Structure formats: structure tokens, C-alpha cells
Regions:
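N-terminal catalytic cores of NTP/NDP-binding nucleotidyl/phosphoryl-transfer enzymes
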Residues: 1-55
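Non-catalytic positions within long, well-ordered alpha-helices that form the structural scaffold/packing
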Residues: 26, 60, 90-91
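Acidic, Ser/Thr-rich peripheral helices and adjacent loops at domain boundaries
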Residues: 54-57, 353
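A glycine-rich helix N-cap at a beta->alpha junction
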Residues: 61-71
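Active-site cores that bind ATP or allylic diphosphates and position pyrophosphate for catalysis
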Residues: 70-417
Length: 417
């Protein structure tokens, strides 16, 4: 085994991620650690809190050797689409093994469950439960008679194995036992959840940045907030990246989610039900309820009106991303059938340099501007959506000077020595 793939989002990178990479380095010291990372948008159906360029740099500083971007079509997809796209990229890049966080380290149990996911009886029960109004995850949990699927990441782990069985039978799996609760909202230890960190950065960072820009000076409240943020980040982020991340927050180079939500809400108001119907996941007449809810005072209020067991908040978020990025049902279907059309290099270190010289099933892109010339029609669509995702994310940054478009075209893969 020469290479291990890690499918990740690093939204943001923290001690839990460093723990996984460190564990792999100890267990497989001579093996390259290649991360397939969500880019400007993540599976929650919204922009990542930091740019993919910052997150890729931090990942290498935190123990990864190579960072490859997962195209936005997959990174904003359902668990099945996300997992399938990532695993097919792992195969296209000839990566030997796949490591992922899991609520159980019992690999045989996970493989056994994954094998039953596509059985006719399981699929029949799944359809029945979904027709009763259950979410995809809940319906699968009941159809498979297992409680392992009680978190989003547990479902993703099974989707990786499911995709591997279908597209990459020789792929090895290395589950790493999780050390934090996926949705824990408080910073209770040195291994926090991504949710807790995003909330910390958003609340404390908003106060400090807004205070600086509005007054030109730091208020006592702002100083306290900034100090608390710095202290808490330093206890939850690897020392190699803590000061860098704090500087990025201080510069306002992170997402203001209110700006993004207003963008989705505005698009929802100007798009007719007939137009909504062409975008991913708009089925069963929900486009009419969506248009009606768009008259609410905010995107948050609109989702509260639409939300149901079947249409969870996460699913509605993804639908909002499809609308914002112009991702249609046809594009999603083609992406599921054909798989990733390229692998975009974001960052690497000395250990990863040799690997970059190899040839793979899909183009390894280092120069974004030249890429469309060597891509298929679907690849060009993916390229356009990735560019748009970065541009939309940039528009949502706190600092106006960081809202410049087409950053993808000026970015060079980072060589971290």
C-alpha cells in the first residue's frame, strides 16, 4: 500500500482531523496521505467557512501530503452522490486505500451493512419509508435494521464502502474511530466538532471584525472577544496553523452566512416554480411550497415553513445551493453516471511531489485557465460550477476587499516545504 485517500471537508481543520492524519502516519509511515477535499461549497449545502485555498494549506501543515479538490457537483450532493463521486476519484487517481472517521471501528460490520444497501428487499423498504415521509438517512436506517446510521458521517462512511463495492472492489478501508460528536455545539475539549468551531468563529469573529471596521479601534468588548477566540482556537487547532487561522479571521476572510442566505432567498423570490423544477432535488411539487415560503422575511423563516421529515434542513440547504449554482437534475444525473472528469491540485508537500509526476485516468489540473481545453463537455460544466462556487463564496466574505471574483484563475497550487 503506497497511498491512502482521506475524503474530507476540513470545515475548518481542527485537532480531530490532525488526530486522524497522525494516526495514519504512525500506522503507515511510508504511505502518502492524499486528501480529496470539498472545495468552496460543502455537503451541508452552503459555502465552507474559509476558502479552499486556506483550508488546503492548513491540511498540509496538519499532516496531509496532497490536497485534491472534490468538484462542487459532488461536494454539495446527497450522501450517495458525495460518496460515489469521491470514491470514483480515489479510483481514478489509483489510490490504494481509503480512510474515514467512523462511529465504529468494526470494518466487517460496515462492509456487511454496505453490501445490503442495494439488495432488492432493502431498496423496496427504503422506497416505502421515503414515501411515508422519512428522510433518506432515517429510511435507510430502518430498512437496514441498524442504528449505525444515526449520524450524517456514519451514513457517508457506508456510502464510501457502497461505492467502493460498485466501482473499486480492490479498495482497502481504514476506519478511524471518531473522537467527537459531529453536531456538538460547544467547545468542551481539545477535539471539537466542526459545528462548534464554526459557531465559535462566526460569533466571536463577527464581533471583532465588525468592531474594527466600524470604529477603526478595538472596543473593550471586542478585545475580550478576540482574546477568547484566540485562546479557544489555540486549544482546538494544531499549533502549526492556529496563528494563521486567527489572522485569516482577523482579516475578515471568512463567510458571513447571512449574506449567503439573503442571496438564496433573493433567487428563490425571482425564480418561478416552473423554473425551480429543473434544479436538483426539486421534486413532488415542492417548488410551489418553495415559492410560497420565499415570501417569508428571511431564508431561515422560509426553511422553517418548508421543512419536514422528508425535506430536512440539510436537504433544503443543498437545494438552495443547487439553485444558487445552477446545478440541474440533468447535470447531477450525468455526474452520477460518468464520475469526476478531473482532479484539481490545491496543495502538496515534499512527500507529494513525486506522486504528481504520475499519469492517471483523469487529468490532474494545476493551471485552471487552460483546463477547459482538455475536458469533456461534462468536465467543462464541472469547471464552470467550481469557478462559480468560489466566486459566490467570495461574495459572502466579511471583508469587502476579499470579495474579488475569479480567484480560481489566479491561484497556483501551494507547495508547502
Amino acid at each position: 500500500m503506497k497511498t491512502i485517500g482521506i475524503i474530507c471537508e476540513y470545515n475548518p481543520f481542527h485537532n480531530g482531523h490532525a488526530y486522524q492524519l497522525h494516526t495514519l502516519a504512525q500506522q503507515h509511515p511510508d504511505t502518502l496521505r492524499i486528501c480529496i477535499m470539498s472545495g468552496s461549497f460543502v455537503q451541508r449545502g452552503e459555502p465552507a467557512i474559509f476558502s479552499k485555498f486556506d483550508r488546503a494549506r492548513w491540511a498540509v501543515l496538519g499532516g496531509a501530503d496532497i490536497i485534491i479538490e472534490l468538484p462542487t457537483i459532488y461536494s454539495t450532493g446527497s450522501a450517495q452522490l458525495f460518496g460515489t463521486g469521491a470514491v470514483r476519484m480515489v479510483k481514478a487517481l489509483a489510490i490504494d486505500a481509503l480512510s474515514f472517521g467512523s462511529e465504529t471501528a468494526d470494518l466487517n460490520a460496515l462492509i456487511n451493512i454496505a453490501k445490503h444497501m442495494d439488495c432488492e428487499s432493502t431498496q423496496a423498504q427504503l422506497r416505502t419509508y421515503i414515501n411515508e415521509g422519512m428522510s433518506y438517512g432515517t429510511a435507510f436506517r430502518k430498512a437496514l435494521h441498524t442504528e449505525i446510521l444515526n449520524t450524517p458521517n456514519a451514513l457517508l462512511g457506508l456510502e464510501y464502502i457502497r461505492a467502493g463495492l460498485a466501482y473499486n472492489p480492490k479498495l482497502q478501508y481504514i476506519p478511524i474511530l471518531r473522537t467527537s460528536n459531529h453536531h456538538e455545539e460547544s467547545i468542551t475539549n481539545e477535539l471539537p466538532s466542526g459545528t462548534a468551531l464554526r459557531q465559535l468563529i462566526t460569533s466571536a469573529g463577527n464581533l471583532s471584525y465588525q468592531s474594527i471596521t466600524s470604529t477603526g479601534n478595538l472596543s473593550s468588548q471586542c478585545i475580550t472577544s478576540t482574546g477568547n477566540l484566540s485562546s479557544q482556537l489555540q486549544s482546538t487547532i494544531p499549533p502549526s496553523i492556529a496563528s494563521d487561522m486567527i489572522q485569516v479571521v482577523d482579516n475578515g476572510n471568512y463567510v458571513n452566512y447571512n449574506r449567503y442566505h439573503d442571496m438564496v432567498h433573493s433567487l428563490s423570490r425571482r425564480t418561478t416554480p416552473k423554473e425551480l423544477d429543473k434544479f436538483g432535488d426539486f421534486n413532488e411539487g415542492i417548488e410551489h411550497l418553495w415559492s410560497k415560503a420565499a415570501q417569508q422575511s428571511s431564508w431561515t423563516a422560509a426553511t422553517e415553513e418548508i421543512k419536514s421529515k422528508r425535506y430536512t434542513y440539510a436537504r433544503l440547504q443543498r437545494m438552495g445551493a443547487y439553485l444558487t449554482l445552477g446545478i440541474t437534475k440533468d447535470v447531477l444525473q450525468n455526474a452520477m453516471e460518468e464520475g469526476p472528469q478531473y482532479a484539481r491540485l490545491l496543495a502538496f508537500n515534499d512527500r507529494g511531489r513525486q506522486w504528481l509526476r504520475n499519469k492517471y485516468e483523469i487529468p490532474l489540473i494545476q493551471k485552471w485557465a487552460k483546463a477547459p481545453n482538455e475536458l469533456s463537455t461534462l468536465g467543462q460544466t464541472m469547471h464552470h460550477i467550481d469557478t462559480l462556487a468560489t466566486d459566490i463564496q467570495a461574495l459572502c466574505f466579511h471583508n469587502e476587499s476579499n470579495r474579488i471574483g475569479h480567484k480560481d484563475y489566479t491561484y497556483t497550487p501551494q507547495y508547502i516545504k
